[in-house]
Amino acid sequence: GGMIANAISKPPGSRECGKGGSCGVPNLIASAVSSRGSVDNVNAIISGLRNSGFAQSDVAYWAYTGTGTMEGKEPAKDLRTIAALFQEHIHLVALKKSNINSVKDLKGKRVSLDEPGSGTYVDAKLILESNGLSTSDVKAEALKGKAATDALRNGKVDAIFVVAGFPTGAIVELASAVDVKLVPIDGAGAKALTSKYGFFSQSPIPSGTYEGVDEVNTVAVGAQWFTSAKEDNELIYQITKALWNKESRKLMDVGHAKGKTITPESALSGVGVPLH
């Protein structure tokens, strides 16, 4: 978020684009703020609390259509897409010494599903269901980020779900401190999941992404950037133009491991909510 906020910002008095200054939108100062995740971000955009935000493609589509996990809620018809950014892989992490080797092995175990307002919680719930389990079949914990990895490291939980572009810092840190494994999300369960929900795709996390962890088959969703239909057309156009500027490309290439995968060629990949 901070990387993209920097790319689209151009504060008053800053240097010219191409001469050491930002190639962002003139006089725009964008700031990245933390949130509880995809559901929180979508709600904040629709309520006008935030001008834009990142969300998982599945969560945004369900919010826009009032279907899936948002069944019974008023469709978020003002939600609009700016661009698809990168893939976020579902990491199911357990200690290497554990006997958890598949999703079905989670039955009866202490599992962090993340906070109920997050996209991770939604995905974890669907992954459990596609493998014949429900959230009531596990001892669910609502831990996020470092609280989740610390709990796994200290034996307070048996497994954690994390949805993030790899490598994600919290798991890099965890894997350097204790022997962990990524539990596969594959086979019939993954096939059922990707067949029912088109936003999921089967995609591996390569060997060596995390210390001592072999390649594992898992599933992924798209991380996309959203705004409201009420935002000014010209402003969103200029923001989009700044995002794809060649100077912004340099920032993204070095700013995050996933930065290089944010490209104009994939900007419409998996988009299920109308563009602004």
Role assignments for model-derived ranges:
Residues 3, 25-29, 37-40, 47-50, ...:
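Extracytoplasmic
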Residues 18-73, 146-151, 157, 166-175, ...:
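Pocket-flanking alpha-helical
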Residues 57, 68, 98, 134-232:
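Pocket-lining segment of extracytoplasmic ligand-binding domains
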Residues 1-20, 28, 84-154, 249, ...:
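Bilobed "Venus flytrap"/periplasmic-binding protein-like clamshell domains
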Residues 72-88, 208-217:
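A structural signal for short loop-to-beta-strand junctions that line the ligand-binding cleft
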Residues 3, 7, 40, 44, ...:
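Extracytoplasmic/secreted proteins, especially bacterial periplasmic and envelope-associated proteins
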Residues 4, 147, 154, 164-182, ...:
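An extracytoplasmic/periplasmic, membrane-proximal ligand-sensing/linker region
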Residues 110, 116-126, 198-266:
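Ligand-binding clefts/hinges and TM-proximal coupling segments of bilobed small-molecule sensing domains
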